[in-house]
Every structure is written in C-alpha cells, then in structure tokens.
C-alpha cells in the first residue's frame, strides 16, 4: 500500500518501528513501547496488523523468549483513549441484518480489563484472595474463592481517570458526528466494577446534556445483552460504547455483519490528542502462508488503505496541509470507485447482491486498480 498508493504522491516524513514478532522478541518488546511513545510525540500514527503469540506460535517460532503480550494492548495502555470502529459501506454489499441502513460505530475503551489482567493456575485445594494495599498502609482483602482442586483465577482492573476519559471521548465524538450514543455493561452482575463504569458515564453526561438536547441527540444506558438485541433490531446510525473486551468482540460482529472484517476503520483517540489508525482485523495468517508458498492471495486491503488515508488526513488537518487532506479524500474515493466498478477481492465478491457484476482479483491487482484511479 505504501509503495503503490502513498509514496508516488506523498513525500512521507515518518519514523518506522518494526513490530514484527521476531523484532519484538529481539528487543524484549521495547520496540512496542518506543512506538507508543513516538505516537505520543508526533500525534499521529499508522499501525499494521501484528501477531500476538500463543502456544501454537511458540512452536512455530521456537526462538521466542516468552509469550509476548499483545502490542495493541501495550500501545493502548500507554496512550489510553478510546478506539472508534466504523464499517465502510458499499452499495453492492448489503448487511446481513436486513434492517441495517446506516453504519454502527463501536466505541471501545482501550485500557485495562482482561487486556491488563493477571492470571493464576493452581494445582491444589486452597483459597485465592485479593488484597489492595494503599499508600497509607491500609489494607483491604477479599476472598475470591475457596477451591477443592486445580483452578484458574484472574485479576483485572481499570482506573477512574481512564473511564472518565473514555466517557468524555464518547460524548464528544457523538456531538462531532451528530449521532446518538448507547452504552452497555452488565452492572446487574458486576455491581461495583461495571457499576462504576455506568456511574461515571451518568456523571459525565451532565456536562454534555444541554449540547445533546440542542442537537436532538440521545444518550442511554442498557445492559449488554439488551443492547445486542436492540442493535440487531435497529436501523443503525448510532455509536455503541463498550468496555474493552465487549468492544473487541462486538466490533468484529458488526463489521462482519455489514460485509467484511476488512471493511472497518479503526482509530485510537487518546485524551491528550494522539491518533493511531489501523485496520480492525488481524494478520490473516492463512493467506500469508499461501503467499509464502508462491500462491496468489485475494486479501482485502481496504481497511489498511483507510488507516493510511485517515492518518494522512489527520496529519493534514493538524499541520494545515490542505493538499494532504485532499489526497486522503482522493485515496478513499479511488478505493470505493474501484469496488463500485466491480473490481474486488474474494471476500466481497462472494457477498455482492444478485445482478451485480463482480470480478475477483488478487490483492496486488486490487491495489493496481486503485492506483490507476489516483
């Protein structure tokens, strides 16, 4: 994408950080921290999909020193902020949910919860407790569970400051794009943890209520299971704010139901004004292995193209470079026009409406077709 679509038109002034699994291994993951700090320094970043290793990957990469954490988790922890994910719609592909007419943006809290959790596996009977030791010296201990055999435990956290930043980002984003905001947790079960999220959202909304009313916008809270039912019955056209894990899962569901996971934009917005753009999907491992075998792949690059266009547009806005923002617009329009003309990758050609003439091309051929329209 960079070589075919960006460099022929833009004199990039960028720093590059190699977040490949082996380089993260070689640097003891310091490169990920450096990349996050560089994003804080420069304000705008583009991130490619990365590998988070599991036990299977340890067998594939025996040189790995450990199961390195998710680079996304590390970066989001450093930047804090909120991830906004919005599907890219085209006329030739209708959503699997027939009544969806407008995009649904998932606002995902980008800090804490299971992504900063600690896990414990035990092999004997006993009791697991959780202790908070304040700087004052005061301690609070809770019993998690007594077990009569092997068990697993997990401890997770979040910070009120981060939750407030999340709430404010969601309310401001709703005002910016003039859409209703929904927020969902499970505070009937998680009365303190999820209940704190709900209380903070309710408190912060009071500072935005008048502006919401002036625009005729609505904010409402509902339980996560009720929210899922409401989303499916809706026509779309709103922002759905979710905790970290809920947003991870639901954004994949939303993007796939709208057409393809490769048709969803993703931007992390931090409280201090940093913007990190990426594709919402992962590394598409099976396609990569086929590519290594010399086979042609038809992998949809649109979300990564839009990550580049989003970052270039934001850079242009911040630096008052209208030519750069105009190029970002042209890049997106060239990509959409290519799809409208029937040139598309296999994930989309299998979903087009009856009567639409689609030609399935490889990833490289699709990029060439977009480049020809720039």
What kind of feature is each model-predicted range?
Residues 1-7, 130-222:
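Glycine-rich phosphate/diphosphate-binding loop of Rossmann-like nucleotide-binding domains
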Residues 9-33:
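N-terminal beta-loop-helix "entrance" segment that forms/cooperates
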Residues 9-16, 177-185, 209-221, 316-328, ...:
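Flexible, glycine/charged-enriched surface loops at secondary-structure junctions
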Residues 16, 21, 193-240, 244, ...:
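Active-site rim loops that border cofactor/substrate pockets in soluble metabolic enzymes
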Residues 21-24, 231-341:
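Glycine-rich phosphate/nucleotide-binding loop
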Residues 24-139, 245, 249:
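N-terminal glycine-rich phosphate/adenylate-binding segment common to multiple enzyme folds
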Residues 110-112, 116-167, 174, 321, ...:
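Glycine-rich phosphate/pyrophosphate-binding loop and the adjoining helix
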């Amino acid at each position: 994408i960079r070589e075919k679509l960006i460099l022929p038109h833009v004199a990039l002034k960028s720093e590059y950080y190699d977040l490949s699994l082996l380089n993260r291994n070689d640097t003891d993951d310091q490169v990920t921290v450096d990349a996050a700090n560089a994003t804080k320094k420069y304000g705008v970043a583009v991130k490619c999909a990365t590998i988070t290793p599991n036990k299977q990957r340890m067998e594939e990469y025996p040189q790995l020193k450990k199961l390195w954490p998710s680079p996304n988790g590390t970066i989001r922890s450093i930047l804090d902020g909120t991830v906004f994910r919005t599907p890219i719609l085209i006329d030739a592909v209708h959503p699997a949910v027939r009544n969806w007419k407008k995009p649904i943006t998932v606002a995902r809290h980008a800090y804490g919860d299971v992504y900063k959790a600690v896990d414990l596996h035990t092999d004997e009977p006993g009791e697991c407790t959780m202790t908070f030791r304040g700087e004052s010296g005061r301690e609070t201990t809770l019993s998690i569970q007594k077990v009569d055999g092997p068990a697993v435990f997990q401890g997770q956290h979040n910070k009120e400051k981060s939750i407030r930043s999340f709430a404010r980002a969601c309310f401001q984003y709703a005002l910016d794009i003039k859409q209703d905001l929904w927020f969902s947790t499970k505070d009937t079960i998680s009365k303190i943890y999820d209940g704190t999220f709900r209380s903070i959202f309710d408190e912060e909304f009071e500072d935005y209520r008048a502006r919401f009313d002036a625009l005729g916008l609505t904010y409402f809270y509902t339980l996560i299971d009720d929210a899922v039912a409401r989303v499916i019955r809706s026509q779309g056209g709103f922002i759905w704010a979710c905790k970290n894990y809920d947003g991870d899962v639901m954004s994949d569901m939303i993007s796939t139901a709208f057409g393809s996971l490769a048709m969803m934009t993703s931007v992390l917005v931090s409280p201090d004004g940093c913007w990190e753009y990426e594709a919402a999907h992962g590394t598409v491992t099976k396609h990569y292995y086929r590519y290594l075998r010399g086979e042609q792949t038809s992998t949809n690059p649109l979300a990564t193209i839009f990550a580049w266009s989003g970052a270039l547009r934001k850079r242009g806005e911040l630096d008052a470079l209208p030519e750069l923002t105009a190029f970002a617009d042209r890049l997106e329009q060239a990509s959409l026009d290519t799809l409208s003309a029937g040139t598309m990758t296999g994930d989309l050609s299998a979903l087009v409406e009856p009567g639409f003439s689609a030609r399935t091309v490889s990833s490289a051929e699709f990029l060439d077709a977009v480049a020809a329209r720039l």
